[in-house]
Structure formats: C-alpha cells, structure tokens
Regions:
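Glycine- (often His-adjacent) and acidic-residue-rich active-site loop
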Residues: 20, 39-71
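Short, active-site-adjacent cap segments at secondary-structure transitions
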Residues: 42-46, 90-92, 106, 197
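C-terminal long alpha-helix characteristic of the crotonase
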Residues: 106-107, 111, 162-208, 234-238
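Conserved CoA-thioester-binding segment of acyl-CoA-metabolizing enzymes
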Residues: 1-38, 59, 73, 77
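CoA-thioester-processing core
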Residues: 91-144, 174, 178
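Glycine-rich beta-to-alpha transition loops that act as phosphate-gripper elements at the mouths
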Residues: 85-91, 144-149
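Well-ordered beta-strand positions
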Residues: 103, 143, 147-149, 155, ...
Length: 238
C-alpha cells in the first residue's frame, strides 16, 4: 500500500506542475498497488490554480487542460484500489480528484465538497464530467453540476460524493484499512472488474470534439475576465 499525501502550496491548487507530478507518481506504481490519497491541514485540494490560469492565459491553458485530464484519468483508471482520505475542503477539481477514487472517506469536520466550475465560468473536460457522473447519485447529478453548490460531509454522503464520514483522528487509519482490505482481493480479478465498471465512462471520455470546444471556451478573453473576477471576489471573502 502506498500513501500519497498532497503537498503543493497552501491549498494543493492544481497547476501544470501539480498534475504532471501526480501523474508521474501513479505511473511509477506497480499496477496492482493500493493507494491512499490524502493531504494535510484543512484542505484536501482547492481545485485548479485559477491565478496561474488567469496569469498564463491561453498558452498556459492549452498545456494545462490535457495535463489535468491525464492526471484525473490516470487516478481513475489505476488498476489497483485507490482510497481518498478527504481531510478537508475538496472543491472543484479537488472534488473531482477525490471522486476518482474507488472509496472516499471524509473527515466529520472536513469542510465542504463540491464542483464549482459553473460559478467560475468554465466547462468540465470530458474526463472530469465522466468521473463525476460515476460518483454522484443520478438524481443529484444535474443539481451538483449546474448549481455549483458545495456540501457538508452529511449532505455529500447522501449524494454519493463520499461513502463514509469518519472521525478526523481516525481518518487515515480507516483509509489505510480500507485500502489494505481491497488490496487483499485477487489483483487480476479486481483490476478487470474495475475496468469493466469504468468502461462506459472511459469510452465517453474520448471526445476530441468536446476537448476542442472546451479549450476554446477556457481560452476566450471573456472567460479569462470572468475567472479574474471570480478570483478577486474569492480573495476578498478570505
């Protein structure tokens, strides 16, 4: 079992470097290796580093979006078990990363979780959308995507974002136990079963037409203006 602890700045905001590093860490694992993914403090991940996006503009975005999708699909399709120990806020891309795990445990006082992309003004890449479609209970899927709402752990478990609410002091211990239990299953059968479960989502992720349309929206001047405004409002609140 491998413990991967996110540690990238104050909020584990997803930059190009973050995505490439996490992809590389998973690529270096043996295929059947169980993984526990967690972070420190009160934030699991605040999602995409919007400051980098707004500063880097279109040239940065054209590199970042493929790296983001590769990272998320790498975690989602890892043949071994992946358990997310969500220690704190998991917002936007941070929520998607958590939902790429097979088992999701969240600390009782772990803050909020949800996908806020619609509020930022950017569409989901197909990889992110399909991960969320797999995680969220069908009756709550449209609400979660189109409202941009974030949820308490109790609200999140009812909607499928997470599977269990755990006391903070035992979160990591429980996550390791869950990963160890899954790792004890016959690895070849586990990997194939997981691939069969994910097959429809993995097929829907292959949408070059949507990728191009999404990149066009992300790189549009009006979108970048909206992102800058969202960042400014967020900083004022904090």
């Amino acid at each position: 079992m491998t413990l991967l602890r996110l540690a990238h700045g104050k909020a584990n905001a997803m930059s190009l470097e973050f995505c490439e590093a996490l992809t590389a860490r998973f690529a270096a694992l043996s295929p059947g290796r169980a993984v526990v993914l967690t972070a420190g403090g009160h934030i699991f991940s605040a999602g995409v580093d919007l400051l980098r996006v707004s500063e880097g503009g279109a040239p940065y975005i054209r590199k970042f979006l493929p790296a983001l999708s590769t990272m998320l699909s790498t975690v989602f399709s890892h043949p071994g078990s992946v358990v997310a120990a969500i220690n704190g806020h998991a917002i936007a891309g941070g929520c998607v990363l958590a939902c790429a795990a097979d088992k999701r445990l969240m600390a009782r006082d772990g803050g909020r979780i949800g996908v806020t992309e619609i509020l930022v003004g950017v569409p989901f890449p197909p990889v992110a959308m399909e991960i969320m479609r797999c995680a969220i209970a069908p009756q709550f899927f449209v609400e979660a995507i189109l409202s941009g709402a974030t949820y308490t752990p109790l609200e999140a478990v009812a909607r499928g974002f997470i599977h269990e609410i755990i006391e903070p002091q035992t979160l990591l211990e429980r996550a390791v136990a869950a990963a160890t239990s899954l790792a004890a299953l016959p690895p070849t059968a586990f990997a194939l079963s997981k691939r069969q479960i994910h097959a429809p989502a993995l097929e829907r992720m292959q949408r070059p037409d949507l990728d191009a349309a999404i990149e066009q929206i992300w790189t549009a001047p009006e979108t970048l203006d909206h992102i800058r405004g969202y960042v400014a409002r967020t900083l004022r609140k904090s």
